[in-house]
Amino acid sequence: MKTIITLIFSVFLLFQLSAQNNQKQKVTHLPVIDMHVHVSKVRPGSGPLCPWFLSNMPGADPNEEFNFANVMKSDCMDPLPAATSDEEMKNEITGRIIEKNMTLVAFGDPGIIRSWMAEVPEGRIIPGISPGKLTVEQFRDSLESGFYKYMSEVAPQYSGMSPSDMSLDPYFAVAEELGIPAGIHMGTGGNGMTNITNSKYRASLGDPFLLEDLLARHPKLKICVQHAGYPMIDNMLALMGANAYVYVDISGMIWSYPLDDVHEYIKRLVRAGFGKRIMYGTDFMTWPRMIETSMGVIEHAQYLSEDQKRDILFNNAARFFRMDKSQFDWPEGK
């Protein structure tokens, strides 16, 4: 009799746990794709961050020590706290992936990327890889392995190079041949990047027009101009008009520069007819709540229709990666 009672109780618990699990997995959010997530070990001592911290850049003098605390402000009403450990970061990010029905395009430390992937449903993290110090053969092997789906983040601007520099051309040729899209950093790098942080950096090398020779050599290469070439909107629009496979992500600028200017930049892209080629992204690094902050910029943009918001938050990126929308989780009735 005791055995039967134990068996019945065990079956009851099994059904209860199954019901709870199904309830937890119930989808309530429309899918979102974040095109720009950096993955690395947590840096000890990282402080909190105020969104749109570059809204009032400090005056500075070369005879005075430059204090980054004056730029990376944390004196606002609700600063974003930094993750304090790799485990905390993993839990914060994978929890958001599930809760907010997100897919992240992530690049950086492959070991950490794999550990995140193990915690979320299949396909919810899309790994990217930059050529970095890889030979062309090593880069090809990495892409042909099937693990990496994106060539990113390619950032020659920080090395004082144009994206059309011929030293990079064999890597882009491999991506074009294999049908792998590429993400290229173009635009600003932050306050004092050249004279304080990186003497090789040149603002002029973020000009979207510098992509023209690359695109002419590789007409079937699909690219994402990361950070949307901010603040060079006129050249960005002209490049997109001349090249049908150029998309942009609005990462980085979306949480750092003055919010009014960010909205105006996005508005210009939409007004010029490129609403189908703008993709949401955070340029995520250290602060988990940056995801909600960045997403809110699009969700609360009154100049965007609901269809335009869905294009930016999901549809355009799904098309960019040639994804089947039926493979995503959707709320009931959607």
Functional labels for PLM-detected ranges:
Residues 21-25, 109-193, 200-202:
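Active-site gating/metal-coordination segments in enzymes
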Residues 3, 19-78, 91, 274-277, ...:
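Mid-to-C-terminal alpha-helical segments outside catalytic/metal-binding sites
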Residues 50-87, 92-111, 125-130, 149-153:
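Divalent metal-dependent hydrolysis catalytic cores, especially in the metallo-beta-lactamase
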Residues 149-150, 164-279, 331-333:
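Catalytic pocket-lining loop regions of alpha/beta-barrel enzymes
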Residues 6-16:
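Bacterial N-terminal signal peptides
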Residues 45-58, 119-125, 198-203:
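Aromatic- and acidic-residue-enriched segments that line the glycan-binding/catalytic groove
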Residues 37-39, 106-109, 129-131, 152-156, ...:
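A cross-domain feature marking catalytic cores of carbohydrate-active enzymes
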Residues 40-42, 111-114, 134-135, 159, ...:
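Active-site environment of divalent metal-dependent phosphoester hydrolases
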